[in-house]
Amino acid sequence: MKLKLLLLTFILVCTGCKNDPRIQAAYDLIERVTPGYGEQFKLELMEPIDGMDAYEITSDNGKVVLRGNNTISLATAFNQYLKYTCNAHVSWFGNQLDLPKQLPMPAPVKNTINGKYRVYMNYCTVSYSAAWWDWERWQRELDFMAMNSINMPLSVVGLEAVWYNTLLKHKFTDEEARQFLAGPGHFAWQWMQNLQSYGGPLPKSWIDKHIVLGKQIIDRELELGMQPIQQGFSGYVPRELKEKYPDAKIQLQPSWCGFTGAAQLDPTDSLF
């Protein structure tokens, strides 16, 4: 009787682990990066080590066993296995994934991951490198992040739609709201609150498309166990807001390098 109960408990635990969304997200990543190889891996959850994210790589009955305390740790283990057991490579500039049909068994590895918060990207990175990326390219980048232990990426794709819809609620027309927004290659400077309108106006089709793309990116980041960094409001506003709300405490900033200065809404003003 005890043996039957023990066996039943083992089956339930194994089934529960396989259905765990953290494990499923890692399996999905493996299939995206190395299609058809997912069945050769066995993924398991483990406890953190001394409060730090951790992973293990080993083998069991002809399968590569990856253990981690979350999806990012499992993805890190997968990347380390590819690098140091398969001599494979996943990078921005190309992948070397010439893998044998039957994957080699690894030597046992157990490591912790440095740092609780592993931040990735800044405004310039997104604007200069990723301004024109589509969902296919973003999927590759998100997998690359997870495989390199990133758990807190900057996530500002679609921020232009937040501005657009907010301005429509504050006396701006469609044309005025779109005219305020800079072109995609100059978003970095606008999100850092140095300018407005340069390279614009944005077409409405761009705004609509990037609402969808931004949601896809955040959904995938959350699926992978990341904590996206999103922008709050600091008081930067369109210069034209002073015309819409003449009594608001709005300070026009000095011009710089040929650019007309931006505007700043006083945080003590009720409009803030």
Residue ranges of model-derived segments:
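Sec-dependent N-terminal signal peptides
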Residues: 4-13
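Short, non-transmembrane alpha-helical segments in secretory-pathway proteins
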Residues: 20-34
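Aromatic-lined carbohydrate-binding surfaces of glycoside hydrolases
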Residues: 36-37, 44-51, 58-67, 71, ...
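Bacterial Sec-dependent signal peptides at the C-terminal "C-region" and cleavage site
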Residues: 12-21
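Aromatic-residue-lined binding/catalytic grooves and analogous aromatic/hydrophobic interfacial grooves
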Residues: 22, 83-86
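Conserved short beta-strand edge segments in small beta-sheet-based binding/regulatory domains
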Residues: 89-91
